[in-house]
Curated annotation (Swiss-Prot):
Belongs to the PIGS family. Glycans are attached at N267, N370. Pathway: Glycolipid biosynthesis; glycosylphosphatidylinositol-anchor biosynthesis. It comes from the Eukaryota. A cardiolipin binds at R15, R18. Residues 40-517 are lumenal. It comes from Rattus norvegicus (Rat). The gene is Pigs. This is GPI-anchor transamidase component PIGS. Pfam families: PIG-S (PF10510). Its main location: endoplasmic reticulum. Heteropentamer. Part of the GPI-anchor transamidase complex, consisting of PIGK, PIGT, PIGS, PIGU and GAA1. It is a multi-pass membrane protein.
C-alpha cells in the first residue's frame, strides 16, 4: 500500500511539472507573440525612397513657341533653312532646393497664305482678328509672328507687340545674323508672356528665405481649389448718408467675366453685405489747408483689424476669403483721402493687403449736402468702384503688369480684364507652387513618421501618399513636355492628396500612448497568470538541478 501511494504521488508530481511546462510553453510561444502582434502599431509601408528623391527634383518648364516668318522678314538664304527647331534653356536663380529650368522650344516655319494676308494689313487689331484661333492653341503655348522690318503693322518706333491672346509680333531684319538677333527678341517677348524670375519667385514666396523675393508685395494668394469673395459696404453714419449700390449689377458686369476666365485656377463664390455703424478704428488727421481728412500710410495696417471683426468669421470656410470693402466716411470726417508714403493722395483712394483683400474710401460729393436734408441719398458709381476692386483682385492673385522688353507695344486686356497668356502664366506659377507645397508636405510627413514610431499609418493614408507622389511625378513630366493643363491638374491632385495624408486624424490615435504606458497597462493583467507559472518553473528547475547533484547510492 505504501509503495502504491508513493507511486501515485510521484505520478501526480510529474503530471504537475508537465502541466506547468505546458502552460509556460503556451504562454511564451503562443501568448506572448500573439499579444505583441495584436498590440503593435500598424504602419502601412510608404515610398520613403521616392519621397526623399523629391528633394532633388529638377523642374523643367517647357514653353512651346511657334515662330512664323513672313516674306521679307529675314534674308532669302535664311528662309530656305526653314523649318527647324531651336531650344533655349536657362536656370532660374532662386535660393530653393528645387532646381527650376525654363526651356523655350522655338519651332521656326514659314507663314501660310492666310497668315501672310492677315499680317499685310495696316492694323494690328485687324490682323489679330484674322489670325485668332485660340481654340487651336494649347495652354502655355505661344505663337510669334516675324514681320518685315519696314512693315506698317506696328508703329515705326516699336520692335515688338504682345497681344491679348497667345500671340505676339516681332520685327524682322535683313542681316546675316538675323536668326540670332530675332531669336533673342523672341525670347524676351516669350519670357514676358510666360515665365520670369519675378513670377516664379512670387509663387514660391512661402518657400524662399526672407529676402527681396519674399516681401509682402510678392505674396499672392496661395493656390487653392476655391476662393470666397465678399464685397462689403461700410456706412458708419447712416443718419447722414443713405447709401445705395447696385452690387449685383456691378459684379455681373465687371467681376464675373474676370472670374469666368479665371475659373481654370479655382472655383469662386461671391457674396455681399452692408454694415452700418462700422468704423475704421483709426482717427484720420485733419488738413486745414485742404479742409479734408487723411489717413497716412503707416496707419493703414491698423484699419483692418477693427473692421475685420464686423465682417463675419471666415474660420468656417474651407477656402481663402477675400474681402473688398467700400467705406463711405462719416460726415464729420469727410472728405477722407488715403496718402502714400510721400504724403501725396492716392489716385484711387484705396489700398490692398496681400492675401486679405482691399479697402476703398468713397467720398460723397459735397454739393449734395447744400440742397438736401439729412440723410442724403448717395448713389455709388459702380464702374469707378469695380475698376479699383478688379485691379486689386489681379494683384491679389499675382497677376501683375508684365515687364515687357524695350520698344514693345503691350495690348490691353479684353472686357474680361484678363489676357489669355496671363492666365497661362498664372497656371505656370500655380503648378510650381503646388509642387513645392506637395513635396514639402510629403517630406515633412516622412520625417515625422520616421521620428515617432507609434504613429499609426493606415492603408488609406498610405494610398494618399502614393497618390501624391505619383501626381508630383506626373506633373513634373507634364511640365517638361509643355502640357500646362494636365500639369496643373496633376499638381492640384498632389497638393490635395499630400495634405489629406498629413492632416489625417488617424495619425494622432496612438501618438500619446507610448510604450511605457503600454507595459504599465498590461503588466497588472499578466502578472496574476505569470507569477504561478514562473514559480512553478523555478521549482522545477531547482528540483531538477538538485536531482543532478544527488550522488548515486552504491550497494
Amino acid at each position: 500500500m505504501a509503495t502504491a501511494g508513493a507511486a501515485a504521488t510521484d505520478l501526480e508530481v510529474v503530471r504537475g511539472k508537465r502541466a506547468a511546462l505546458f502552460f509556460a510553453a503556451v504562454a511564451i510561444l503562443l501568448g506572448l507573440p500573439l499579444w505583441w502582434k495584436t498590440t503593435e502599431t500598424y504602419r502601412a509601408p510608404l515610398p520613403y525612397s521616392e519621397i526623399s528623391g523629391l528633394n532633388a527634383l529638377q523642374l523643367r518648364l517647357m514653353v512651346p513657341v511657334t515662330v512664323v516668318f513672313t516674306r521679307d522678314s529675314v534674308p532669302l538664304d535664311d528662309q530656305e533653312k526653314l523649318p527647324f527647331t531651336v531650344v533655349h534653356e536657362r536656370e532660374i536663380p532662386l535660393k530653393y532646393k528645387m532646381k527650376i529650368k525654363c526651356r523655350f522650344q522655338k519651332a521656326y516655319r514659314r507663314a501660310l497664305e492666310h497668315e501672310e494676308e492677315a499680317l499685310s494689313l495696316g492694323s494690328v487689331h485687324e490682323a489679330e482678328a484674322l489670325l485668332a484661333e485660340p481654340e487651336k492653341q494649347a495652354e502655355g503655348s505661344l505663337t510669334v509672328y516675324v514681320i518685315s522690318e519696314h512693315s506698317s503693322l506696328l508703329p515705326q518706333d516699336m520692335m515688338s507687340y504682345i497681344g491679348p491672346e497667345r500671340t505676339a509680333i516681332v520685327r524682322g531684319m535683313i542681316h546675316r545674323e538675323a536668326f540670332n538677333i530675332i531669336g533673342r527678341r523672341i525670347i524676351h517677348v516669350a519670357q514676358a508672356m510666360s515665365l520670369t524670375e519675378d513670377v516664379l519667385a512670387a509663387a514660391l514666396a512661402d518657400h524662399l528665405p526672407e529676402d527681396k523675393w519674399s516681401s509682402d508685395k510678392r505674396r499672392p494668394l496661395k493656390s487653392s481649389l476655391g476662393y470666397e469673395i465678399t464685397f462689403s459696404l461700410l456706412n458708419p453714419d447712416p443718419k447722414s448718408h443713405d447709401v445705395h449700390w447696385d452690387i449685383e449689377e456691378g459684379v455681373q458686369r465687371y467681376v464675373q467675366p474676370f472670374l469666368n476666365r479665371l475659373s481654370a485656377a479655382g472655383n469662386f463664390s461671391v457674396d455681399s453685405q452692408i454694415l452700418y455703424y462700422a468704423m475704421l478704428g483709426v482717427n484720420p488727421r485733419f488738413d486745414p489747408a485742404s479742409s479734408s481728412y487723411s489717413l497716412a500710410m503707416h496707419s493703414l495696417p491698423h484699419v483692418i483689424n477693427p473692421v475685420e471683426s464686423r465682417l463675419g468669421s471666415s474660420a468656417a470656410s474651407l477656402y481663402p476669403v477675400l474681402n473688398f470693402l467700400l467705406y463711405v466716411p462719416e460726415l464729420a470726417h469727410s472728405p477722407l483721402y488715403i496718402q502714400d508714403k510721400d504724403g501725396a493722395p492716392v489716385a484711387t483712394n484705396a489700398f490692398h493687403s496681400p492675401r486679405w483683400g482691399g479697402i476703398m474710401v468713397y467720398n460723397v460729393d459735397p454739393k449734395i449736402y447744400n440742397a438736401s436734408e439729412l440723410p442724403v441719398r448717395v448713389e455709388v458709381d459702380m464702374a469707378q468702384v469695380m475698376e479699383v476692386f478688379l485691379a486689386q483682385l489681379r494683384l491679389l492673385f499675382g497677376i501683375a503688369q508684365p515687364q515687357v522688353p524695350p520698344k514693345c507695344l503691350l495690348s490691353g486686356p479684353k472686357s474680361e480684364g484678363l489676357m489669355t497668356w496671363e492666365l497661362d502664366r498664372l497656371l505656370w506659377a500655380r503648378s510650381v507652387e503646388n509642387l513645392a507645397t506637395a513635396t514639402t508636405t510629403l517630406t515633412s510627413l516622412a520625417q515625422l513618421l520616421g521620428k515617432i514610431s507609434n504613429i499609426v499609418i493606415k492603408d488609406d493614408v498610405a494610398s494618399e501618399v502614393y497618390r501624391a507622389v505619383a501626381a508630383v511625378q506626373k506633373a513634373a513630366e507634364a511640365l517638361a513636355l509643355g502640357h500646362l493643363s494636365s500639369a496643373f491638374a496633376a499638381s492640384q491632385e498632389a497638393v490635395t492628396s499630400s495634405e489629406r495624408a498629413f492632416f489625417d486624424p488617424s495619425l494622432l490615435h496612438l501618438l500619446y500612448f507610448p510604450d511605457d504606458q503600454k507595459f504599465a497597462i498590461y503588466i497588472p493583467l499578466f502578472l496574476p497568470m505569470a507569477v504561478p507559472i514562473l514559480l512553478s518553473l523555478v521549482k522545477i528547475f531547482l528540483e531538477t538541478h538538485k536531482s543532478w547533484k544527488k550522488p548515486e547510492k552504491i550497494d
